Amino acid sequence: MATIDDVAKAAGVSTSTVSYVLSGKRPISAPTRARVERAIDKLGYRPHAGARALASSRTNVIALMAPLRVGVSVPVIMQFVAGVVTRARDFNHDVLLLTQDDVSGLDRVTGGSMVDALVMMDIEADDPRVPVAAAAKQPTVLIGLPQDPEGLSCVDLDFDAAGRLAVRHLVKAGHTDIALIGSPPEVLRRHTAFAERLMRGLRDQAKISGVTVKVEACDSTPTGASEAVDTLLATAPETTGIIVHNEGALPHVLARLAERGAVVGTDMSVVAVCPTDVALSQRIPMTSIDLPAEDIGKVAVDMVMARLESEQPSETRLLAPVLTERESSADGPAGPLD
Amino acid sequence: MATIDDVAKAAGVSTSTVSYVLSGKRPISAPTRARVERAIDKLGYRPHAGARALASSRTNVIALMAPLRVGVSVPVIMQFVAGVVTRARDFNHDVLLLTQDDVSGLDRVTGGSMVDALVMMDIEADDPRVPVAAAAKQPTVLIGLPQDPEGLSCVDLDFDAAGRLAVRHLVKAGHTDIALIGSPPEVLRRHTAFAERLMRGLRDQAKISGVTVKVEACDSTPTGASEAVDTLLATAPETTGIIVHNEGALPHVLARLAERGAVVGTDMSVVAVCPTDVALSQRIPMTSIDLPAEDIGKVAVDMVMARLESEQPSETRLLAPVLTERESSADGPAGPLD
DNA sequence: TATTAATGTCGAAGCGCTTCGACGAACCGG
DNA sequence: CCGGTTCGTCGAAGCGCTTCGACATTAATA
């Protein structure tokens, strides 16, 4: 491999000049720059990342912690990941992927200065990674909202507002008996932030609107979905509006409803909280509140890069939920409220 | 951040001694080692990855190219990824994730010595990345089989054998009219290796067994699956055995078959080629040939690490397919052949 | 007991890059 | 026409680590 000195020699300049051509941190005359550039691609020179990291204390790598936990939809995780990776490249950064949610990986990459910054997904209310990340010298952005962000920046869909929006939508259409088919029990047991926030929004709005909301946890399997639907139909047969917040279970919930004779979009209104592509690839185009996973990933990178470039106060960005009406919801027994 | 010199000073030894304690490359007496180790965790010392990379020309990072292409099942990709990441950690390596299939990313990370080795997924017959990887100084393992591996190691399920096995299984059960519902047209257009190999195996065995195999490409959408099923039933109504090689379409294929009145496991035998968990999470437990994605990922890492530790000739490892009978297949019109 | 071989530790020379201060040359206004 | 800028370039000092050769010690061998 050619080194910067080889390039300097070939171009007849000093190494620092080559470095400045590369970084643009000092003015270089056009002819010199041209000579250097010619030498660079004649030799096929690539700066050594480690040497660069050592000298500049910048790695141009960010870490992405994307725990592959049971109960969370893998395609949705990947949408976040894709957003992060894509946007990181726009900032000339690469992504180091950590799939275990252990704290050890975290301080390996931060302590060892392997990365310039951190993005962490799937944050729990009381996540052990948060204090560790807060103590690191690298800026961190959380996708999700812990109880105490400890000065870290956060970004997520405003699930609280999403919950309220979903209920309002159903109430406005005349539904008074509403249910949530939610995350798998494991997810709730972990106090995953987004699940709890949606439920809070739901309940708050239900109280305000004076309607009932029955909550049913649901495994992301055909069986789990069937059970959830069955117990719902058994314990709250008057239900006419269902909110589904579980990408994996959604198709099976719809299938079970069909088997049980409930016609979605007529007898039963269903609002999904999920990425748009998931909403559209069901048997019926679903009325849904979009979970803009890829965008959130991109915003996370934007935020973390901003903090890298200049000291900035931490901020929390909650994206406003957008509900799109499609064919899975209709007016309820009380008729449209206008 | 504490440096190795700080540790040396604190322990009253030279820096090289600290280094040798860390690497174990030279014998160090127990008391010295103890003093050094105490100093290390008193200071919270972490070696600087860049400095280490520069001095040792080892980064302890491997690159994983996992292009997120249309038509390939995201959960399946993630199983490969999970296998790679997990196993890499066993070798004390982290994973740099590249999701674009462009060659530029490839030589950024190899040329810049950002990684020690490479694992590339989703290999096409004539993949432009292959020659580039072959020219890199880092060892590379391909998950998939290009036309010309150019001295690189490869690992994959033996799709050729899988195709033959699937046909043999159906023929033995008395089916003579067999069909494949395969990958999406985009995947075939890209000449993705595994899709073509499965089809080759299928056809070879069909010729040998004297049966017909109708091949139907299939989008991984409800519509795509329905269309595939419909045209199959229209153009080859005598079909009694179907092989499905398309994780995304599988549930929709089964749904459509049900709608069309074909009882899977009785009228119609279906063999899936997919990961076991996918086979088990269908409406019926599917007879399937396992695609051991996570294992393949792990093997890829094992192979690449072996080449890293000692110069070894390249090898191609094709995992033997295993068919597990479950409830989606049964004897056909000609009855069991024994 | 003299000789050789481990064993344990140190010092110093890099690894390839960035960056700071310095310096000559060209350029400005007064 | 001269002091003060600005521009373009250079040299050298690190960044924090690994690793090689050297050098004492101590243990094993004859």
Regions found by a protein language model. Name each.
Chain A
Residues 1-60, 333-338:
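N-terminal helix-turn-helix DNA-binding module of bacterial transcription factors
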Residues 226, 235-338:
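Flexible loop/turn connectors
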Residues 2, 61-168, 234:
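Alpha-helical recognition/docking segments in bacterial nutrient-uptake
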Residues 67-75, 100-103, 155-165, 181-228, ...:
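Hinge/beta->alpha junction and helix N-cap segments in small-molecule ligand-binding domains
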Residues 14, 60, 116, 176-177, ...:
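Short acidic/polar active-site loop segments enriched in Thr and Asp
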Residues 17-20, 57-70, 177-187:
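Short beta-strand segments enriched in small/hydrophobic residues
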Residues 43, 173-175, 232-238:
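Glycine-rich phosphate-binding loop signature in dinucleotide/nucleotide-binding domains
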